Curated annotation (Swiss-Prot):
UniProt-recorded name of the protein: Alanine racemase
Pfam families in the record: Ala_racemase_C, Ala_racemase_N
Protein family: Belongs to the alanine racemase family.
Active site, UniProt feature: 44, 271
Cofactor(s) the protein requires to work: pyridoxal 5'-phosphate
InterPro entries: Ala_racemase (IPR000821), Ala_racemase/Decarboxylase_C (IPR009006), Ala_racemase_C (IPR011079), Ala_racemase_N (IPR001608), Ala_racemase_pyridoxalP-BS (IPR020622), PLP-binding_barrel (IPR029066)
Enzyme class: isomerase
Length: 376
């Protein structure tokens, strides 16, 4: 018999979250008197741990998909996705352009070397590109003083039949908090003002939820947003949970109690004996540890749901197991279901906060050894 741990991926929750984002953007567009943007559903890192094929099915109503990895883009095509696909880091060597050509992909361009590779490529069709501006995050993109010349070269490649649409994009560093997006948005608008029309994309999850008005399209200008984490039912914000936006968790990590210990007062639990029972208590052993993707740094007090009752983790997380306080669940015993996070448990963001990290990391870190079930 396999260990009693598995992750469930809800396709209905994925579709619901996409619809929540779409309605949010529709309302912003109506208020601003413009048109709502199109949505690139971001499915990088194996769809934030949820699986590429599940994401293709769950996000079937999106206008496009965005990711980093060429192999994942190919999997999308093999899963039946026929719409636009954007490679968020573009390409790294000339051979990548052969796959981009074959599978009809679009690419982010953020270096002169990528423009050089495009100029030397022999492709069967034009490649749509998004020219990225470094507006202040200082990660990827052309600096403001180099962007104009890079854009001009992209237009030359378009005239030569190599490039199709030439879009403009940037990435916000602080859309989830202070100082927000105003400074970077000013840089983006100043640098790109007057450049030839093409699609524009500036909003990630946080900006899409908090500043949807900046993605509203006016006139013939096409806008795209790039929501990621919110589509999986987790929050990009430290000060607002996903449920407050109407989002539902798409991944649920579940296991069972596999052992019970009746402890006297003063007994210690787990590696390092970091937890000591203040009174006689029952402790349950759960088949889940850091080798399954549960955060090792989650300490005593991290929320867990056992048999439908909220309780707490006690002691250190082991490689394959963790321990929970069963006093709030007197009927619990071996075989009692446990929800580590998800639809019937604490939110992944709660667990992440207790471990000093973010929900993104936990979702992406689900271990390959954990069986995954897809729910419709």
């Amino acid at each position: 018999m396999p260990r009693p741990i598995h992750a469930s991926i809800s396709l209905a929750a994925l579709a619901h979250n996409l619809d929540v984002v779409r309605r949010h953007l529709d309302q912003a567009a109506q208020a601003a008197g413009g048109a709502p943007p199109s949505i690139w559903a971001v499915i990088k890192a194996n769809a934030y741990g949820h699986g590429i094929e599940a994401a293709v099915a769950g996000f079937s109503a999106a206008q496009g998909l965005a990711m980093l990895d060429l192999a994942e883009a190919v999997r999308c095509r093999e899963a039946g996705w026929g719409g636009p696909i954007l490679l968020l880091e573009g390409f790294f060597q000339p051979a990548d352009l052969d796959l981009i050509d074959r599978y009809h992909l679009s690419a982010t361009v953020h270096t002169r070397e990528q423009l050089d590779m495009l100029a030397q490529a022999r492709l069967s069709r034009r490649v749509d590109i998004m020219l990225k501006l470094n507006s202040g995050m200082n990660r990827l993109g052309f600096d403001p003083d180099a962007y104009g010349s890079a854009h001009a070269r992209a237009l030359q490649l378009r005239e030569q039949g190599v490039v199709g649409a030439v879009g403009r994009m940037t990435h916000f560093a602080c859309a989830d908090g202070t100082p927000g997006v105003a400074g970077q948005l000013r840089v983006f608008q100043s640098v790109t003002q007057g450049l030839a029309d093409g699609p524009v994309s500036v909003c990630n999850s946080a900006a899409t939820l908090r500043y949807p008005e900046i993605a509203v399209a006016h006139g013939a200008q096409a806008h795209w947003v790039r929501p990621g984490i919110c589509l999986y039912g987790a929050s990009p914000f430290a000060d607002a949970d996903a449920a407050s936006f109407g989002l539902r968790p798409a991944m649920s990590l579940r296991s069972q109690i596999i052992g019970v210990q009746d402890l006297p007062a003063g007994a210690e639990v787990g590696y390092g004996a970091t937890f000591r029972a203040e009174r006689p208590m029952r402790v349950g052993v759960v088949a889940c540890g850091y080798a399954d993707g549960y955060p090792r740094h989650a300490g005593t007090g991290t929320p867990v749901v056992v048999g439908g009752v909220r309780t707490r983790l006690v002691g250190r997380v082991s490689m394959d197991m963790l321990m929970v306080d069963l006093d709030p669940v007197p009927a619990a015993g071996i075989g009692t279901p446990v929800s580590l996070w998800g639809q019937d448990g604490p939110s992944v963001d709660e667990v992440a906060q207790a471990a000093g990290t973010i929900g993104y990391e936990l979702l992406c870190a689900l271990a390959p050894r954990v069986p995954v079930k897809r729910d419709s």
